[in-house]
Amino acid sequence: MPRGRKSLSPWEHHLGCLPSTPACRVWGLQSCPTQGTPQPSPLLCRDMALQNALYTGDLARLQELFPPSSTADLVLESQAAEPRWSSHQRGLWSLTYEEELTTPLHVAASRGHTEVLRLLLRRRARPDSAPGGRTALHEACVGGHTACVHVLLVAGADPNIPDQDGKRPLHLCQGPGTLECAELLLRFGASVNGQSEEEKETPLHVAARLGHVELADLLLRRGACPDARDSEGWTPLLAACDTRCQSPADAEATTTRCLQLCRLLLKAGADADAADRDKRRPLHLACRRGHAAVVELLLSCGVSVNAMDYGGHTALHCALQGPATALAQSPENVVRALLNHGAVRVWPGALPKVLERWCTSPRTIEVLMNTYSGMRLPEEAMGLVPPETLQNHQRFYSSLFALVRQPRSLQHLSRCVLRSHLASCLPHALPLLPLPPRLLRYLQLDFEDVLY
C-alpha cells in the first residue's frame, strides 16, 4: 500500500463528505452547535443500492447496509418532482429537474415505511434534520402516515418546527388520513394557534380554506382561536366562505362543507361580520361563491346586508359578479335572500348588463325585476339574450319583454308598496303578518317563472 494512504471502509466507497461548514450554514434549519461541541457534517450518499432499498422499503436489505456500528445520518440527492426554469448560459433558459437534498429518514417517512423509520432512528438518524428545508415529520404529515408521525414524535421530533416555507407540521395535515396525524401532533405539544411565518395562517385557516370539517372541529375543540387573523386580515370564517366550487357536479357538496364549517366557527364564537383589509366580509365572499345556504345562515346572524367593501361593492353586487360555476348553485336563491333582508336594489341603469350576464338563469332575472314597480329595460334589451336562451325559456322572456311596453299588474304593485313600507324590518315583519302562506310566499318573492 502506498505510503500515506489508508484502506477505505465499505461505506467510504459510496459516501463523500460534504464541506466542513457548520451544519446550520449548510442546511439553514439546523441550530449551530455550541463552541467546543462540533457536530460532524452529514455524509453524502450516492449508493444506488441503498437508495433503491429506501424507496422500496426493503427492511432486510437496509439491515445489511446499516449494521449496528453504522450511522444513518446521511444526505441523499433526489430529483425534484417538477421541472424548473433555469439558465446555464446567458440568455438560454431550459426546463430542468433540479437536484434536491433529502435523508433516508425523509424517504421512509414520506412513503410510510414505519419499520424502516425505526431502524434509521436506531442508527442515529436525527429526527429534525432538514437538508432540503423540511423535516421527516413534515413529510409524514403530508402523506398522512400516522404511524410514522407517532414514531418520529416519540423519537423527539419537534412538532412546531417550520419548513422552508414557514409552515409547521400541523399546517400540512391537509389530505386524506391526516386527521389522526393532527391529533398526534396536538398530543405531543403542537401549537394549535401556531402561525405560518409569511402568511400568518393558523392550522384553522388551512382547514377552513380546504373545507376540512373534521379537522376544523378538532382544532376548535383543542382551543383554536376562531377569529385569528392572517397577514391579509382574513379570519377562518372568511376562508371558509371563499370555498370555491371546482365543477357544477361538485356544487352541492362544496356548499354543504362550507355550511358545516361556518356553523362550527359561528358556534365557537367567530365574528360573522369580520372584515379583511379590503373590507370584504363573509357575506361578500359567500355571495360571490354562490353558497345560498351560507348566505341565509349569515343573514340570520344579523350581518350588515348593505355593507360595502373597499371597492364599493355590496353583497348583492358580489352575487351578481359571481363566476359561471355559480349557476349550478342556484344564484337566484342568494339574490332573493339578500333582497328579502333589505338589500339595496341594483341601479336600474345596470339591469341590461345583469340581463346579459345572467340570462341563462331566468329566475335570477325574475327576482330582481319583481323588486321594481315598472320594467326598467330598454326595448332593445331583447338583443342581449342569445336566441337559444330565448327558445329554452320562451314563456319567461315573452312575459319579460311584453312588460317593457306596458305597466305591471295591480297585484305586483301592491307587493312593491308593502315591501317598500316594511323595508327596514322586512325579514322580521313579513312572517308575522296574518296572511295565508301562499300570499306570504308571494310577498317574499316566490318564483313563478313568469312576470306580470
Which residue stretches match the model-derived regions?
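Ankyrin repeat start-site detector
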Residues: 45, 100, 131-133, 164-165, ...
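Intrinsically disordered, low-complexity Ser/Thr- and acidic-rich flexible linkers and loops
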Residues: 80-100, 243-260, 322-330
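Ankyrin-repeat inter-repeat connecting loop/turn
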Residues: 72-76, 94, 127, 159, ...
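Cullin-RING E3 adaptor/co-adaptor recruitment helices
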Residues: 2-31, 37-42, 68, 80, ...
